[in-house]
């Protein structure tokens, strides 16, 4: 009996050690996403019937003075805002019966609004996820600054791509693929996502500029949360003495600026990853689903609250970007319909939307099944 209780309630138990950290991170990210939809909808004069964290039967809730039902539902793996006139939680316009709405509700219904209001409301969810990531990074930069090193090579691994390309200790990176380099981390950021690509480097050597080419090879590393990650590397390193390791501190505005830059880098790396993944150049095990996220949440929580919040930032931008994929019922799929409507001056036909919703739903479910299979069996 005691062993059973420890399994679920001990500090390293399934409940306290894994489920609670996972639900904490996921709930905050989902709440911010749905709050983005809700707030912009309110600003646009759109009425909301329900704001739910989770799906399925309601566990608890209340109705506010605007008639919106705020609730916590039984299945805590997501959430939704149901607007006036919605037939489902996905805000699909297919099957909407406007004749059943009162005149007042028709004015506040989602699907009767101008296309720009609908697009703004839909885009707000992913946008708020990105804003959450920027906000978290801003706080971390303000509190802890950033550890940097000069882009100087202290050593070249024998037989590595860098050795074959002619890199030498003492070389200073000036640019990679035309992008200016100011820190050693800049080189790592660019190279890590370009395994197998021939990259152009410019280094400063004895006061002269030298152009080199190298093809990063895949190396497997273990990140701070214990995940096996595959990255591109050319086989150079720096040291504290050569790289002049130091910490830069930032003021409030500088922290926000650095957070925006860091978030932009993550968006760029994510886009590059999926382009390479689509043509079979990335490892499928780099994609994970709820089981992997729960495992990461557990490991992050065991290392401290700061780690859990950093994971929240990464999950938030991941969910934001995923929702911008141009597939219904994701937000990006809605935005495609609104873009077509804005161009042609009339909505996409109900029949066409129904077809795309079914195709999109199957693709989204297939992707979810794929990452879950990775979690449980393949990786």
UniProtKB/Swiss-Prot annotation:
Amino-acid positions noted as binding Zn(2+) in the UniProt annotation, renumbered to this chain: 33, 37
Topological relation to the membrane, as annotated: Multi-pass membrane protein
Molecular function terms from GO: metal ion binding; metalloendopeptidase activity
Location, primary (coarse class): membrane
Statement: the UniProt record of this protein carries the keyword Signal: no
The keyword Zinc appears for this protein: yes
Leader sequence residues: none
GO biological process: proteolysis
Catalytic residue positions: 34
Domain of life of the organism encoding this protein: Bacteria
Cofactor(s) for this UniProt protein: Zn(2+)
Name of the protein: Putative zinc metalloprotease BR1156/BS1330_I1152
Organism: Brucella suis biovar 1 (strain 1330)
